[in-house]
Design a protein with these regions (language model features):
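Short catalytic-loop micro-motif centered on adjacent basic/acidic residues
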Residues: 44-49, 72-73, 123
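Short glycine-rich anion-binding loops that position phosphate/pyrophosphate groups of nucleotides
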Residues: 9-11, 76-79, 102-104
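Short, structured coil segments at secondary-structure junctions
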Residues: 41, 92, 118-119
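Short beta-strand elements in bilobed, periplasmic/extracellular small-molecule ligand-binding domains
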Residues: 31, 35-48
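Glycine- and acidic-residue-enriched helix-capping/strand-helix junction motifs
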Residues: 14-28
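Extreme N-terminal starter segment of soluble prokaryotic enzymes
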Residues: 1-4
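N-terminal small/polar loop signature for handling phosphorylated ligands or for N-terminal nucleophile
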Residues: 50-73, 77-93
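Short, glycine-/small-residue-rich phosphate/pyrophosphate-handling segment
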Residues: 47, 97, 106-149
Length: 149
């Protein structure tokens, strides 16, 4: 089983940017956590981060072309603005989980709108970096039941 973990703008600055909201874990540490959890679940996790919307669309399309079984996406600020990401996720029809490190529903009003949620099987918010591991567990369970595809 292969999952694509796609991260949007500023997530490369985890551990630096607003630790009160996002914690002290760096992006490199997050990727290591994901890879360790993937090994326990006997799956391959392809981790990617970009600050550019078109690059994220390209990665979603690559997930389709590479026959990924699932996508975990933290679109960051693009959550609230990107119809392009919504359209890309809808077009590939790969089971997807939206993850946010902070509890976006308790932050500014504009952060409470998610354009991509409509293309996702689940949304996980406010669980810190552990939300990614929860998303991996969810997709493994969903896919092992033969659901989602």
């Amino acid at each position: 089983m292969k999952l694509y973990i796609i991260n949007g703008p500023n997530l490369n600055f985890l551990g630096i940017r607003e630790p009160a909201h996002y914690g002290n874990t760096t992006y490199a540490e997050l990727v290591e956590m994901i890879q360790n959890h993937a090994a326990k679940l006997c799956l391959v996790a392809e981790c990617y981060q970009s600050n550019h919307e078109g690059d994220l669309v390209d990665k979603i399309q690559e997930a389709y072309l590479q026959k990924a079984d699932g996508i975990i996406i933290n679109p960051a600020a693009y959550t609230h603005t990107s119809i392009a990401l919504l359209d890309a996720l809808k077009s590939v029809q790969i089971p997807t989980v939206e993850v946010h490190i902070s509890k976006v529903e308790e932050r500014e009003d504009f952060r409470q709108v998610s354009y991509i949620r409509a293309a996702c099987q689940k949304t996980i918010t406010g669980h810190g970096v552990n939300g990614y591991l929860e998303a991996m567990d969810f997709l493994c369970e969903l896919l092992s039941k033969g659901e989602g595809k």
